[in-house]
Amino acid sequence: AINQISITEERDEAVDFSDGYYDVNQAIVGFADSAAAGATSVADLQGLRLGAQQGTTSLDFITEQIQPEQEPFVYNDNAAAKAALDAQQVDAIVLDLPTAFYVSAVEIEGTAVIGQFPTTGDSPEQFGMVFEEGNPLRDCVNEALAALEESGELDAIEQEWLSEVVDAPVIELAG
């Protein structure tokens, strides 16, 4: 499956992943007039009602990096998290950056990407394609990804379809 799935150690125990094809940051989406608007650091977000889908790197990011004063609101899927934001039951939701841009541009009128968070740790979060363990197609896909990377085509695709990422302000992790 190619569907914005982040490569994690826990997931890698159950499935095989292709090599990473896109470095992704987490982002926060809220209404332009919400308590989250204008946030420049995680300290500005810690007192807010934040939500994310269960089992996602977005939820992990809230608990591990933002460390809000109250437990995050956890939803079964992104549709429920978006509905909670739309109903203003939460101040903001955390999503991966491409999803955040789509939500704010297409799905929930009046929202904006408040900001994106910088990469943390030794390696960036990456999207990878998911395969059943032992599937021989994974090696073929990895070869194709390597060729796309080497030719510059992967970068060109990112610039054409995901170049908005440069427009999202960075929210500092240090208070």
Describe each region flagged by the PLM.
Residues 41-56, 71:
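Short loop->beta-strand "edge-of-pocket" segments that line small-molecule binding or catalytic clefts
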